Amino acid sequence: MGKKLSVSGYDMWEKESLKNEDNPTPEYNLTEKKILRCFYGDKEYETPVDEMDSDTGIHVSGRLIGGCMDCLVNLTGTEYDYVSEFNDKYKDDGIIWFLESCDLNVFAIRRAMWQMEKAGWFKHVKAFIIGRPLVFGQDMMGLDQYSAVLAAAGKYKVPVIMDVDLGHLPPAMPVISGAYADVSVEKGNITLNYVLR
């Protein structure tokens, strides 16, 4: 058995940085309270996330794979796309996708999710962990960040944990891509317990 490490989400997050020419390395401007949104398939959990406990919370284990959708979607179907091989190698562990986006608007997020789905990337998926997009709160013609992801992820009838501390809106939890992890959501927070093996 390998060494076990644990990381959890943060209480607050930064919607707008105080970084400027005169202050290139400011402290975080933590103005927003983290509120996770959790779905099973395309339906939101009935138990409020902050009331989830060890019995009613989300608990799932598997291999982590993912990153920034802006970059990943450009690899689908190319000679650098080894996702199918990774998925097949770790199918017995199951796959937990962690994804976030930087410059994609909500329509581009939906297209990226569709493209990854059609490339077979979500085979053996056990859960999705979705970070806050840089376009947090954007709504375009009735499409928001949640429905953009759920259009693809919701089909798999697995937990979809959204607004997680990942990606381009800090702070971000360290994620070890390829690691095996036990993921839990309880009392309004997410915890990743890594098992290095």
Tell where the protein language model's regions lie, with residue ranges.
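Glycine-rich phosphate/diphosphate-binding loops and the adjacent beta-loop-alpha structural elements
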Residues: 55-59, 96-103, 129-136
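Conserved anion/nucleotide-ligand pocket segment
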Residues: 1-70
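Generic secondary-structure signature for well-ordered alpha-helical cores
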Residues: 2-6, 18, 40, 44, ...
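Oxyanion-binding "anion nests"
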Residues: 63-102, 106-109
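Fold-independent oxyanion-binding glycine-rich loops
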Residues: 3, 10, 42, 67-68, ...
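C-terminal active-site/capping subdomain that shapes the small-molecule cofactor and substrate pocket
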Residues: 105-197
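Short acidic (Asp/Glu) and glycine-rich catalytic loops that position anionic groups and cofactors
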Residues: 46-53, 92, 127-132
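Generic, ordered loop/turn and secondary-structure boundary motif
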Residues: 53, 65-66, 76, 123, ...
